[in-house]
């Protein structure tokens, strides 16, 4: 199923972990609707402006989210978030995604610079107010993932 001219449902639901563990990673109608809005209003415009965007993690069923140790409040489980990467001429350029979203004042709920631009987590609520929250992920002194508000 095509979600936009450049993105498919299989691309946003693909998970090697789900495949390996035999976990069904299929969205219900509400989550599918959320994914269509996320792709249409945020990810496809980004793709049109910047070029090919790779979705490294998209929709996660609750079972898959538990298996990978994801947050119980993860927007991935609602079909409202993706983790993405952008490569240009074979080089990772994820900061360009981050900068583009800020410059273009694109509507989003949360954007996280994950570990010095290793990937970008970005979400969009289908209904309700989007927070436009910008965070940076890092490892704290105990080696746990922590988040801080980004300086922009």
Where do the model's predicted regions map?
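Extracytoplasmic cell-surface/polysaccharide-interacting catalytic and binding patches
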Residues: 1-47, 139-152
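Structured loop/turn residues at beta-strand edges in well-structured enzyme cores
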Residues: 51, 79, 106
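Short beta-strand
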Residues: 56-57, 75, 110-115
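Catalytic and substrate-binding regions of cell-wall glycan-acting enzymes that process beta-1,4-linked
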Residues: 81-84
């Amino acid at each position: 199923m095509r979600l936009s001219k450049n993105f498919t449902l299989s691309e946003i639901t693909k998970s090697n972990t789900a495949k390996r563990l035999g976990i069904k990673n299929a969205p219900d109608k509400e989550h599918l609707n959320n994914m269509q809005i996320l792709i249409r209003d945020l990810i496809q415009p980004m793709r049109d402006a910047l070029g090919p965007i790779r979705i490294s993690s998209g929709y996660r069923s609750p079972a898959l989210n538990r298996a990978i140790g994801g947050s119980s409040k993860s927007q991935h489980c609602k079909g409202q978030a993706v983790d993405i990467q952008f490569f240009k001429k074979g080089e990772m350029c994820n900061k360009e995604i981050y900068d583009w979203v800020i410059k273009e004042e694109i509507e989003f709920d949360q954007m996280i610079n994950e570990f010095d631009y290793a990937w970008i987590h970005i979400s969009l609520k289908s209904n309700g107010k989007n927070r436009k929250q910008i965070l940076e992920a890092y490892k704290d002194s105990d080696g746990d993932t922590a988040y801080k508000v980004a300086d922009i």
